[in-house]
Amino acid sequence: MSDDGLVSAAASPEERAFEAGLRPRTLAEFVGQRKVREQLTIMLEGARARGRPPDHVLLSGPPGLGKTSLAMIMAQELEVPLRMTSGPAIERAGDLVAILTALSPGEVLFLDEIHRIARPAEELLYAAMEDFRVDVILGKGPGATAIPLDVSPFTLVGATTRSGLLTGPLRDRFGFTAHLDFYDADELARVLTRSAGLLGVTLTAEGAAEVAGRSRGTPRIANRLLRRVRDYAEVRADGVVTREIAQAALRIYDVDGLGLDRLDRAVLEALVTRFGGGPVGLTTLAVSVGEEPETVEDVAEPFLLRAGLLIRTARGRMATPAAFEHLGLDPVTDPLGRTQVSLFTEGE
């Protein structure tokens, strides 16, 4: 993964394989998402007491917050197999039929990016979720015949980063829905402390807090930064990750105190220094930093918006006072009401 992707919440296949060794195995080990954990605990205990699979579960929220981990934990707690697939992998209804008819009783089926499932497959899923059967259509036109196939009772765990793209009929068939929120710094520090123990890394409390503060509220990013800081500590120091070591390491990787990377800061600096804080159009802003508009909109803007550094208006993008402050610049308003910038001086 390139340095520019160091604070991206997306994960490569190699990183997902590495994450497997850090994933919690039980709800008690899972850090953060307190309400969701409590609700899932009650639901799973009730299902075990009844001897039946729990309701279908829909988990929504940004990537890297633990949706896959929770699906794995559910199967572990229920002591049943887990089968994993994704919406893009199911291109035809037949693909889904093959998966559903192969499920064992009580099995947990994890369907990542469920909002991207093909419509014919989605419609087939309705009956499977409600009645544990699928209707296979043989032939075409008036002579087509529907053959019902039984499906073993199962629990579907759907995960989505874009719940607004789910159709109403699909969303309504989930008995339990939960939204995963970003983590606070204390929760991320606990995640880092646990991961450091599993990786054999000596991490001080101050070092954990420093990495947590730059992790954008996302455990996946926190663990990724921890690995880079560990490398620095082993090569340039005595192997102990302190606050100073974390700061020095992340300075090399261009991750600043808020978790902004090179692209984030380039966008923010262009908006503030070249366009006086805005408003400026997306295309113009993207050209000024040598990127495509889609890259700026999809990669840089979401965190800048969430961090309160940028706002979108009908006239274009604008920097907030917090953006000027973060860059060490002082917003100055001239008599015409236009915002200009000047560097802070030591005498101010």
From Swiss-Prot:
Region (Large ATPase domain (RuvB-L)): 3-183
Residue ranges of coiled coil: none
Source organism superkingdom: Bacteria
A GO molecular-function descriptor: four-way junction DNA binding
Binding positions for DNA per the UniProt entry: R312, R317
SMART domains, alphabetized: AAA
Binding site residues for ATP: L22, R23, G64, K67, T68, S69, E130, D131, F132, R173, Y183, R220
Subcellular location: Cytoplasm
Entry-linked SUPFAM superfamilies: P-loop containing nucleoside triphosphate hydrolases (SSF52540), Winged helix' DNA-binding domain (SSF46785)
Residues annotated to bind Mg(2+): T68
Record key words, sorted: ATP-binding, Cytoplasm, DNA damage, DNA recombination, DNA repair, DNA-binding, Hydrolase, Nucleotide-binding
Reactions listed under catalytic activity: ATP + H2O = ADP + phosphate + H(+)
Enzyme Commission number: 3.6.4.-
Domain comment in the entry: Has 3 domains, the large (RuvB-L) and small ATPase (RuvB-S) domains and the C-terminal head (RuvB-H) domain. The head domain binds DNA, while the ATPase domains jointly bind ATP, ADP or are empty depending on the state of the subunit in the translocation cycle. During a single DNA translocation step the structure of each domain remains the same, but their relative positions change.
Annotated family: Belongs to the RuvB family.
This protein's name: Holliday junction branch migration complex subunit RuvB
Organism: Frankia casuarinae (strain DSM 45818 / CECT 9043 / HFP020203 / CcI3)
